[in-house]
């Protein structure tokens, strides 16, 4: 039995091994090349082949081996089929992706083409709009030229009528006619006030008639000639108003009308008044009044240019009536104020005179003191009538100062101030070292009179001459100060021209009265 088994073992592998190798080779070739599913291993065929080759005793073992080999072959075939299916799915996915990419590219191309078409269409529309606007401008320009050409004869006609109206020579027998034709637009305005002002102040004088308002409505104002019969007037009395109306009633057919034309925006805003931009003032500003001629023909002659008109400015304006008691009260107040002003002026003049008199008295007292001091310092003998001489000098100085104050009160203040300002430094500077020439002349005259025993009248005459000399010198000095020193050195007109100009004229007169003609050289040293 054992020997038979060994033989069978030795015999079987030869056939089975060859079969397995063949099967493995076939499976390897299929796996490498990727054979189709038609080359599948059949276990029945394999078992039939093995049974035909092997003997009958070994039939069971051969079938067992063939079954195992068949299962492995079927597994390999299933794996190959799965791989083939996976590859097919991968290929299908690749094809789908390619189709999607192709579709996306087509969509992009379509969109680009559509955008280009839209841009071209928009450009064409813009070009058409520009062409349309250019054509409209050309049409408007042509219409404007045509209107100007058509208006030229009308303008020439209006200018001719205007020239005829502006000339002073016009036929009073012909009826007045406007320079505007029927249904012609005269002018446009932005407000009703401008319209009325133009018609009243400009159009009326140009038309040689007075234009009045017949009726006024919110959207229309009707104008007519004053002589048409019914018009507005400011006369309150009914009888006077009726008389004025009848005097000017002539049934004139001259008519004008002004209509209000609101803008389209205002019409739209009326439907929506709640908008924030809606404003009544803006709507008023945007309104437009159009003045149009209805009937340019009058039935009367034009008013003459030199027509006498009542001048309102020539009337005198009276604030309150004169006959009322209040006016008398005002007049009395004015008179009282004038009297008070006069009294104040008189008081001021009296105060000025009083001040001037007091200043003159002070000056006279100062002069007397100076003379007494100079006499005491000179050491000359006093005369019995020297006190009378001083009294007469004071009285004469007061009289002359009063006369000068009556005629030259305003000048006296300046002169006294300048004299005081000049006398004070002179007195402090010079003192008794340099005596006055007039005082020395008076002292010498008094001494000579005492020696000659001619009495007190000569002494007084000498003193008077000395006083006149001092006053004349002061008067000349004041004139020189007022005139700026231009007439310095002028001789008084009251002095005799035969006197020596180098010697004091008062001293010369005194010497002539005493017969002293050859003593000028001695006294000239004191001058």
Curated annotation (Swiss-Prot):
A GO-annotated cellular component: chromosome, telomeric region
Keywords assigned by UniProt, alphabetized: Activator, Chromosome, DNA-binding, Nucleus, Telomere, Transcription, Transcription regulation
Location(s), subcellular: Nucleus; Chromosome, Telomere
Domain of life assignment: Eukaryota
Chain intervals with Basic and acidic residues compositional bias: 263-281
Keyword GTP-binding among UniProt keywords: no
Region (Disordered): 1-36, 258-281, 328-365, 395-433, 470-527
DNA-binding region, residue range(s): 160-300
Entry similarity comment: Belongs to the RBF1 family.
Gene behind the chain: RBF1
Low complexity bias: start-end ranges: 332-365, 395-428
Primary subcellular site in the record, as a coarse category: nucleus
The protein's role, per its UniProt record: Transcriptional activator that binds to the RPG box and to telomeres. Involved in the regulation of the transition between yeast and filamentous forms and plays a role in virulence. Induces expression of HWP1, a major hyphal cell protein and virulence factor.
Transcription recorded as keyword: yes
Example of a GO biological process term: positive regulation of transcription by RNA polymerase II
Protein name, entry field: Transcription factor RBF1
MF terms (GO), sorted A to Z: DNA binding; transcription coactivator activity
């Amino acid at each position: 039995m054992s020997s038979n088994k060994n033989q069978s073992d030795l015999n079987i592998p030869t056939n089975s091994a060859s079969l397995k190798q063949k099967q493995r080779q076939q499976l390897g070739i299929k796996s490498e090349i990727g054979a189709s599913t038609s080359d599948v291993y059949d276990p029945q065929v394999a078992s039939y082949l093995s049974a035909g080759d092997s003997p009958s005793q070994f039939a069971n073992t051969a079938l067992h081996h063939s079954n195992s080999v068949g299962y492995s072959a079927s597994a390999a075939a299933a794996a190959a089929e799965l791989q083939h299916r996976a590859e097919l799915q991968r290929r299908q996915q690749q094809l789908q992706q390619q189709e999607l990419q192709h579709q996306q590219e087509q969509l992009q191309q379509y969109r680009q083409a559509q955008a280009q078409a839209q841009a071209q269409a928009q450009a064409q529309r813009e070009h058409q709009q520009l062409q349309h606007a250019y054509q409209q401008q050309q049409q408007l320009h042509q219409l404007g030229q045509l209107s100007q050409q058509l208006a030229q004869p009308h303008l020439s006609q209006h200018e001719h009528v205007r020239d005829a109206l502006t000339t002073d020579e016009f036929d009073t027998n012909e009826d007045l006619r406007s320079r505007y034709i029927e249904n012609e637009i005269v002018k446009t305005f932005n407000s009703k006030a401008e319209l009325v002002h133009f018609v009243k102040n400009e159009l009326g004088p140009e038309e040689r008639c007075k234009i009045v308002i017949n009726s006024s409505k919110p959207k229309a104002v009707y104008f007519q000639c004053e002589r048409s019969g019914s018009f507005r007037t400011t006369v309150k009395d009914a009888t006077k108003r009726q008389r004025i109306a009848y005097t000017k009633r002539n049934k004139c057919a001259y008519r004008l009308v002004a209509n209000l034309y609101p803008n389209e925006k205002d019409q739209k805003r009326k439907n929506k008044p709640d908008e924030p931009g809606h404003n009544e003032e803006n709507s008023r500003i945007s309104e437009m009044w159009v003045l149009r001629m209805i009937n340019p023909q009058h039935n009367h002659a034009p008013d003459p240019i030199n027509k006498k008109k009542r001048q309102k400015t020539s009337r005198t304006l009276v604030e309150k009536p004169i006959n009322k008691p209040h006016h008398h009260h005002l007049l009395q107040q004015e008179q009282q104020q004038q009297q008070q002003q006069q009294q104040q002026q008189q008081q001021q003049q009296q105060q000025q005179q009083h001040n001037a008199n007091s200043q003159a008295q002070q000056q006279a007292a100062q002069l007397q003191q100076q003379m007494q001091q100079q006499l005491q310092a000179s050491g000359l003998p006093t005369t019995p009538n020297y006190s009378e001489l001083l009294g007469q000098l004071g009285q004469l100085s007061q009289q002359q100062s009063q006369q000068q104050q009556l005629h030259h009160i305003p000048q006296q203040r300046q002169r006294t101030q300048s004299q005081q300002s000049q006398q004070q430094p002179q007195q402090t500077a010079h003192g008794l070292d340099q005596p006055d020439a007039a005082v020395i002349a008076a002292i010498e005259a008094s001494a000579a009179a005492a020696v000659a025993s001619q009495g007190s009248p000569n002494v007084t005459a000498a003193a008077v001459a000395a006083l006149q000399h001092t006053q004349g010198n002061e008067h000349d000095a004041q004139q020189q100060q007022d005139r700026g020193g231009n007439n310095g050195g002028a001789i008084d007109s009251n002095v005799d021209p035969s006197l020596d100009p180098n010697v004091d004229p008062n001293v010369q007169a005194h010497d002539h009265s005493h017969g002293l003609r050859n003593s000028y050289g001695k006294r000239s040293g004191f001058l």
